[in-house]
Amino acid sequence: MGKITFYEDRGFQGRHYECSTDHSNLQPYFSRCNSVRVDSGCWMLYEQPNFTGCQYFLRRGDYPDYQQWMGFSDSVRSCRLIPHAGSHRIRLYEREDYRGQMVEFTEDCPSLQDRFHFNEIYSLNVLEGCWVLYEMTNYRGRQYLLRPGEYRRYHDWGAMNARVGSLRRVMDFY
C-alpha cells in the first residue's frame, strides 16, 4: 500500500491532501501542487485529470517544490499508485507494430543510444513489471509509465514522438 501527500505551497506548507489509491481527478482536493511527500510506494503524477498530460514518476522521498520532480508547473490533477513487481522485462522495437530490430531489457538503461544505437522507439511490449520511459538520456525529460501490455505505436504510451533516451524499472515500493 502506498501513501502520498500533496501540498498546495512549497516546503510542505498550506492546504494538503493525503492519498493512498489511484485518483482520476484531484481537483476537488487542492487547486495547485507545489510540494509532495511520498511516504511509501511509487507514484505517477499527471498534469491533467484522467491520467493524461505530462507524467512525473516519484518514489519514496520529499519533493519540496515541483522542480524537484522535473515538473513544468504546479498542476497535478490525477495520480496512480504503481504496483510492485518482482521481475522486469521489456522489448523495444525500432518500427511500429513490433517490426524492425528488437532489443530486450531486464535492467535499467541510462542511454538507449549507447545500447540500441538509435534513440527512436516506435513500438514496445512490456512483458513483466512496470517501467518508466524517459525522453532523454540519464532519466531526464518527459516521462511515461509503462504497465504490462502491448504498445503498437508511441501514441499508445502517450508520447508525441518516438524519441526515447532512457528507461528505468519501477522497483522502490517500500
Swiss-Prot record:
Gene3D superfamilies: Crystallins. This is Gamma-crystallin D. One of its GO terms (biological process) is lens development in camera-type eye. Has a two-domain beta-structure, folded into four very similar Greek key motifs. Transmembrane segments: none annotated. SUPFAM superfamilies: gamma-Crystallin-like. It comes from Rattus norvegicus. InterPro entries: Beta/Gamma-Crystallin, Beta/gamma_crystallin, G_crystallin-like. One of its GO terms (cellular component) is cytoplasm. Residues 84-87 are annotated as: Connecting peptide. One of its GO terms (molecular function) is structural constituent of eye lens. Residues 2-40, 41-83, 88-128, 129-171 form the Beta/gamma crystallin 'Greek key' domain. The gene is Crygd. Pfam families: Crystall (PF00030). Belongs to the beta/gamma-crystallin family. Crystallins are the dominant structural components of the vertebrate eye lens. PROSITE patterns: CRYSTALLIN_BETA_GAMMA (PS50915). Keywords: Eye lens protein, Repeat. Detected in the superior olivary complex and fibers of the ventral aoustic stria of the auditory hindbrain. There are six different gamma crystallins identified in rat lens.
